[in-house]
């Protein structure tokens, strides 16, 4: 196991951890259906930027 040679101060530890915080995912509203989806992702019904890009199975 690695063992530190010199103890890190609270300040140095906190500076290292400053980028570790989590943020909520950003959601967008689909233009055609008004459904929420992750930004830059295809919505569950196959639309992206208001256009149908993925063929989805119909419930027949």
Curated annotation (Swiss-Prot):
UniProt biased composition (Basic residues): 7-16
HAMAP family in alphabetical order: Ribosomal_bL32 (MF_00340)
Sample GO molecular function, one term: structural constituent of ribosome
Organism: Francisella tularensis subsp. tularensis (strain SCHU S4 / Schu 4)
Encoding gene, per UniProt annotation: rpmF
Keyword Ribonucleoprotein: yes
SUPFAM superfamilies named among the record's database cross-references: Zn-binding ribosomal proteins
Record keywords, A-Z: Ribonucleoprotein, Ribosomal protein
Biased segments, Polar residues type: 22-31
Entry superkingdom: Bacteria
InterPro entries in UniProt: Ribosomal_bL32, Ribosomal_bL32_bact, Ribosomal_zn-bd
Family (UniProt): Belongs to the bacterial ribosomal protein bL32 family.
Region (Disordered): 1-60
GO CC list: large ribosomal subunit
Keyword Lyase: no
GO biological process, one term: translation
Name the record gives this protein: Large ribosomal subunit protein bL32
């Amino acid at each position: 196991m690695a063992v530190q040679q010199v103890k890190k101060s609270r300040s140095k530890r906190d500076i290292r951890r400053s980028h570790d915080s989590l943020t909520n995912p950003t959601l967008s509203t689909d233009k055609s259906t008004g459904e929420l989806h992750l930004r830059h992702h295809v919505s569950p019904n196959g639309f992206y930027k208001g256009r149908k890009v993925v063929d989805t199975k119909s419930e027949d």
